[in-house]
From Swiss-Prot:
Catalytic activity entry: dTTP + H2O = dTMP + diphosphate + H(+); UTP + H2O = UMP + diphosphate + H(+)
GO CC field: cytoplasm
Gene Ontology biological process terms, A to Z: nucleotide metabolic process
Chief site of localization: cytoplasm
Annotated family: Belongs to the Maf family. YhdE subfamily.
Function: Nucleoside triphosphate pyrophosphatase that hydrolyzes dTTP and UTP. May have a dual role in cell division arrest and in preventing the incorporation of modified nucleotides into cellular nucleic acids.
Pfam families xrefs: Maf
An MF annotation (GO) of this entry: UTP diphosphatase activity
Location of this chain's protein in the cell: Cytoplasm
Residues the record marks as active site: 77
Name of the featured protein: dTTP/UTP pyrophosphatase
Length: 196
């Protein structure tokens, strides 16, 4: 069991996302939360998982000098990839409405990369889930953005909220990845790292 392997290690989760924090709680993996500011800028030539891989590694760099032997740092990044464009978190109401409108009646990819960093080791994994949205009315989109304020969510929506319940007809891949973390992959990778 992973819990036994973790006895002599400390997991640092560099994420302010309450959803990611809850996943670790549900996985029964104790974590120390440490969020440090990073300027999330990436080159325009990067596509899909190249973007999230790059950003998840970038987020780890501010910790490199501080990591102790028994610590494992976990950093991650999620984007919604639609029509060859990466959608991050919307800046405001208008941008959230625009993002969701662009997803309405179509399918898109939600891509998450997770970077595991220890004193002498780094591994990056990524996972993609395809999400299919029904046609949404302008009123539905306005209602969602006004009442749920999805400004901390890639693509301007959360699958587990009202908009997901009424608008998502199917997904291909991990549901938990769309919420913010491919939990099965994280568990497996931590087990491999601690067993090696």
């Amino acid at each position: 069991m992973l819990q036994e392997l973790l006895k002599n290690h400390e997991i640092i989760l560099a994420s302010g996302s309450p959803r990611r924090q809850k996943f670790f709680q549900d996985l029964e993996i104790p974590v120390k939360i440490d969020v440090r500011p990073v300027d999330e800028v990436f080159s325009e030539h990067l596509k899909k998982e190249e973007i999230t891989d790059f950003l998840s590694v970038l987020k780890s760099e501010v910790f490199l000098n501080d990591l102790k032997e028994n610590q494992i740092l976990i950093t991650s990044d999620t984007i919604v990839y639609n029509e060859a464009k990466a959608l991050g978190k919307p800046k405001d109401h208008a941008e959230a409405v625009k993002m969701i409108s662009s997803l309405s009646g179509k399918n898109h990819e939600v891509i998450t990369s997770v970077c595991f960093t220890s004193k002498n080791y780094q591994k990056v994994l990524n996972h993609s889930t395809r999400v299919y949205f029904s046609e949404l009315t302008e009123k539905e989109i306005e209602y969602y953005v006004t009442n749920f304020k999805p400004f901390d969510k890639a693509g301007g929506y959360a699958i587990q909220e009202w908009i997901g319940l009424i608008g998502i007809k199917k997904i291909e891949g991990s549901y938990f990845n769309v919420v913010g973390l491919p939990t099965h992959e994280v568990y497996k990778t931590l087990k491999e790292m601690l067993n090696s």
